[in-house]
A protein has these predicted regions:
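Function-determining sites in protein domains
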Residues: 20-145
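Sec-dependent N-terminal signal peptides of Gram-positive bacterial secreted proteins and lipoproteins
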Residues: 4-23
Length: 145
């Protein structure tokens, strides 16, 4: 009986731990605020940006370019948003809608929506299932738009 109780407790603990929030880690670690460009954009394509597909700049409209002197404040506000990396369920295969685009000095790009992220390296898209608190994400977008 104790064995089953112990196994049940371990299972419960595992379920609780996998649903914990995790801090979002940027593509290149902590960005150098002086060498990045941050924009709020709309990923307009109906099909979204699929993993492995080529990056297409034509389907993106810029809503707002964050001024360089506001980069640090913007990233500080962004880091306050809770992020989750679900271990169960289906993974996203594309992202679309309003996003944060971070362009690094080497040309790599990070696209962040409230329900998923994508990185662009050498023109190829790689999606990740990282979700953010959608209300806090929307408030951030509204604050800087």
């Amino acid at each position: 009986m104790k064995k089953y109780l112990f196994i049940a407790m371990i299972c419960l603990l595992l379920v609780l731990l996998v649903s914990c929030t995790v801090p979002y880690s940027f593509m290149h670690g902590e960005p150098d605020i002086d060498t990045i460009k941050i924009e709020i954009v709309n990923l307009e394509t109906e099909m979204g940006y699929h993993a492995g597909s080529p990056y297409n700049e034509e389907n993106i409209s810029v809503i707002k370019v964050i001024e360089t002197d506001k980069n640090e404040e913007f990233l500080s506000d962004f880091k306050k948003i809770k992020s989750y990396q679900p271990n169960f369920g289906s993974r996203i295969d594309c992202i679309s809608g309003v996003a944060i685009r971070i362009t690094y000095a080497n040309g790599d790009i990070e696209l962040i929506t409230d329900y998923g992220t994508a990185t662009v390296k050498n023109g190829e898209i790689h999606n990740q299932t990282t979700t953010f608190d959608s209300d806090a994400f929307s408030e951030l977008i509204d604050k800087y738009s």
